[in-house]
Amino acid sequence: MAADDTEAPVLSEDEVWEFCLDKNEEGGGSPGSDVTDTCEPPCGCWELNPSSLEEEHVLFTAESIISSFNNDDTRVVRVKVIAGIGLAKKDILGASDPYVRVTLYDPMSGVLTSVQTKTIKKSLNPKWNEEILFRVLPQQHRILFEVFDENRLTRDDFLGQVDVPLYPLPTENPRMERPYTFKDFVLHPRSHKSRVKGYLRLKMTYLPKNGSDDENADQAEELEPGWVVLDQPDAATHLQHPPEPSPLPPGWEERQDVLGRTYYVNHESRTTQWKRPSPEDDLTDDENGDIQLQAHGAFTTRRQISEDVDGPDNHESPENWEIVREDENTIYSGQAVQSPPSGHPDVQVRLAEELDTRLTMYGNPATSQPVTSSNHSSRGGSSQTCIFEEQPTLPVLLPTSSGLPPGWEEKQDDRGRSYYVDHNSKTTTWSKPTMQDDPRSKIPAHLRGKTPVDSNDLGPLPPGWEERTHTDGRVFFINHNIKKTQWEDPRMQNVAITGPAEPYSRDYKRKYEFFRRKLKKQTDIPNKFEMKLRRANILEDSYRRIMGVKRADFLKARLWIEFDGEKGLDYGGVAREWFFLISKEMFNPYYGLFEYSATEDNYTLQINPNSGLCNEDHLSYFKFIGRVAGMAVYHGKLLDGFFIRPFYKMMLQKLITLHDMESVDSEYYSSLRWILENDPTELDLRFIIDEELFGQTHQHELKTGGSEVVVTNKNKKEYIYLVIQWRFVNRIQKQMAAFKEGFFELIPQDLIKIFDENELELLMCGLGDVDVNDWREHTKYKNGYSLNHQVIHWFWKAVLMMDSEKRIRLLQFVTGTSRVPMNGFAELYGSNGPQSFTVEQWGTPDKLPRAHTCFNRLDLPPYESFDELWDKLQMAIENTQGFDGVD
């Protein structure tokens, strides 16, 4: 393709067109674009950008361009990218820096060419006003507009896309009375995970062909008034945006939170969800009731399923050691942050060599897998099975120093400073580990969120085991290795099926016992505190009853709760159920007091900084919630909800550090961490934070005159500290003060400080995982049942077959709560103190199981088959709600 520059007339700046030649031959690319601009016949592109002309670009008038491509198949389309409207905010350090990538593509052959607009700094309503000319095949080509937020720290954030077919576009006609105007296109997500909003304002028209102005004018007059951009049926699916969503069912509303995430509000059931509902998904009242009955275990189950599952065969080599830097407790001091000794190559190499020596001496469990053969039988016959068994990890590989958790070792560097090696995770730290660390953090990812186990798929028996049937029909197992028999299935000890065992924490136990002893028993209060409530109005009724108490000490009396229209005496079980139900209401984002945090786990709660816009009496409600939380701790009950770690730190008046940000918002943490480890001067950051409210962006100064203060290497620690204070403390200071006022009316503030933030969470909310081995080990049997009874074998087999949610629901059915105490089922409490989980033989096989939540007892009829027990147990769990005989 060639042109004569000398014949082109002198043009004004507005008439200058930049023509992008074929970059396949010249190897060029548009400035700032990360996609190579290539033009392949029959296509071309021109960008109206006179300020960035380069030597290889050739200037044309409109007539010369059109004459160059005057044929029956191709057309020249003029694309004007005008502006963006109400874009989503993705830049956590300020307003977004959007640009548009315009891609011409063929659904059959792929991308033909791509150009990029300039970047508009710090705007959610950018104005580009850039024009581009493309030579296209109207019936075959499409144009994809992608909006991105330029990010100098990480990859650019996606803000939305518009996919436009070219065949219905109108043709320009200068003789028309009414000129062609812009159109606003809704920005669409790339996938269901994309968070986008706003519009892209575009103007797209064909240039008229030479000698056919009248014909094109007629076509334009016909198309322009009703110009609607439609999807071409045969377009490439990977470049198409999703179809327009169907209307929301009646009673639903679409909203966006302060983080720009779209969620949906059901005003009939007063619930929120992330998934867009459809009319087909609209549930009946009965189905909504079933969902409400299932909701008590939903939080724990969702939290486990949302985590990534690692394969069990993912072995690590000695070289895959991670170096953990010093805790951020000192990042705000005047001294420079120091890394632990493992950051020094000589120490790291020495540790790796030491581990490698041990692996060589005793065998590497990740690579040494001897093959053993064993004959074992079942009722279906015998077979010979080759079992690949891993070499067990030898204790010498996990040395443990005195006073440290298992697998931890204390060492000293060359300067005599002590540091600690965690051989479990292969990390080092300056901080001395404690025994009371959150046990759930030690659980491998591949052991969480297990799918249900099929009754015939518990896996093969261990080597040397055989299954046989007794003369009375009971199944027993023979261990030929030690020549012993037992009734219990050895596969039920498999931790991958039963769930992780919680480590016993004697430190926490001593703290808890001390805490219970120090809680003062009031003598000048009534014997009991009565509450008569309606299930349908449990939040309002509870609020009026509890906030109507002038003297908070009355709330320390024995709780006596009655639900309207239900029979039963409350010996503790109904009170525990009330704590579960009121938790579900108090922490429901529908009411605007709390919101989901910005973690990958979207169900961890934090206080909504804009709660005052949702409820004028929000501070009174936060005091009420504080009182309820204090009542739960005082009476030894549990709340059904987990909060972000800074919430518990604020209760303990502890400093919130950068490390606490990691579990709440990983992107924010990464950006602040980058600032901490690099010189941020070139970013031109200021001591300000952009906050979006009702579609408007507001600037908040982190300190007086912050908009004029540039973040530099000298003041970056102050900047990080102020950002963290604004993110977690300043915005919710009034709400948190009201919550603590209510909580400390029942629990002394000094007494609660004996716990750390992890222990405080477990004190208020209990464990989040159910360990079936621990559950079974601390279960008692009555009235003819025993561990070796056939019905009990079926019962525990049913528990193993349940997924995490079902196990939680069974636990709530029997105990009245979806949580268990910190130290597991050994410290399960009933109405009169410690009360073990108990299974008692009761009734006839035609009865459903029943529960006594006050005494943690399950009345289980002697069913005649496993299937019958499974069906009846499922039915009881699904349909129970305070019926007669269950207290």
Curated annotation (Swiss-Prot):
Q: Where in the cell is it found?
A: Cytoplasm; Nucleus; Cell membrane
Xref: InterPro entries: C2_dom (IPR000008), C2_domain_sf (IPR035892), E3_ub_ligase_SMURF1 (IPR024928), E3_ubiq-protein_ligase (IPR050409), HECT_dom (IPR000569), Hect_E3_ubiquitin_ligase (IPR035983), WW_dom (IPR001202), WW_dom_sf (IPR036020)
- Record GO biological process: adaptive immune response; blood vessel morphogenesis; cellular response to UV; DNA damage response; endocardial cushion development; establishment of localization in cell; immune response; innate immune response
In alphabetical order, the GO MF annotations are: beta-2 adrenergic receptor binding; enzyme binding; ionotropic glutamate receptor binding; phosphoserine residue binding; phosphothreonine residue binding; proline-rich region binding; protein domain specific binding; RNA polymerase binding
Segment Mediates interaction with TNIK: which positions? 214-548
Q: Which EC number(s) does UniProt give?
A: 2.3.2.26
Residue intervals of the HECT domain: 551-887
Pathway involvement of the protein, from the record: Protein modification; protein ubiquitination
Compositionally biased tracts (Basic and acidic residues): 408-417
What's noted about domains in the record?
A: WW domains are involved in recognizing PPxY motifs in substrate proteins. The WW domains mediate interaction with LITAF, RNF11, WBP1, WBP2, PMEPAI, NDFIP1 and PRRG2.
Protein name, entry field: E3 ubiquitin-protein ligase NEDD4
Q: Which gene encodes it?
A: Nedd4
